Amino acid sequence: VLGEKNYTRYAQEYGVWRNTFVEDDMVKYSSMNVRPEFAIKEEYLYPLIADKYDTSCILTGYFWQDLWAAKKIIAEGVKEHFDIGSRVDGFIAHLLAAGIKVNVIDIRPFPTKVEGLTTILDDATMLSQFEDDSISSISALCSLEHFGLGRYGDPVDPESCFQCMAQIQKKMKKGGRLYISVPIGQNRVEFNAHRVFYADTIISIFDQLNLVEYSVTDNGDIEYNADIHKYDSYDKGRVIGLFLFEK
């Protein structure tokens, strides 16, 4: 909740790191250090206590979803792609590295100039800047489930994500492809974090599109071409459904 920087300040102020391995390591470091400019000083302490016993590399669902979608888009030979709310430091970066022009649809301009990345200022629930049947490649990876819950400062609106889904398929051209991911399980809202959907609910919402592939990420792994109903009542972790649709 606090974030790493703020938690570190909290840990230092309240001595959370004291009587832990950090204190022992400080003593050892100080006894061995021969460079005065690199001596430990109280004002520069930045104690991190979680990393020592953390797994060196955990492949999260976000890693797999970003890789899954990017590989498919690159393989399709797409030159220009549109996106709603996906991770810039993962999925979008993959596409940019492959030389694909990416148009991010957002109500706010992107704060930094990045080669190949353009912001289209638009409300994703309306997509008023786009003609019907005009988009050939579009994605929304783990973003639509957050719409209308107020978590990111957006207006509270229970229908917001469903309006966006309706507009996406309306704006897609014949032969166009949609890459979408959402949490999978029993239909529900876990306010104000996100919504969870049956896989079949997503398929029924995008009734103007054909499902090409449904895969899932689960606890650091990916399962390709999963059964639609396999995770309807799954409660052993967070499952992300990966949907590829074509119009």
Summary of predicted features, one role per range:
Residues 150-152, 177-203:
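Conserved class I S-adenosyl-L-methionine
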Residues 152-157, 229-231:
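Short glycine-enriched, charge-decorated loop/helix-capping segments at active-site entrances
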Residues 75, 80-127:
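Class I SAM-dependent methyltransferase SAM/SAH-binding core
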Residues 155-177:
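A short glycine-rich, Lys/Arg-flanked "PGG" loop and its adjoining helix->strand segment in the class I
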Residues 1-80, 94, 190-208, 212-222, ...:
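N-terminal accessory regions of S-adenosyl-L-methionine
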Residues 127-138:
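A short acidic, Gly/Pro-enriched loop at the edge of an enzyme's catalytic core
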Residues 139, 144, 148:
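A conserved beta-strand element that flanks and buttresses the S-adenosyl-L-methionine
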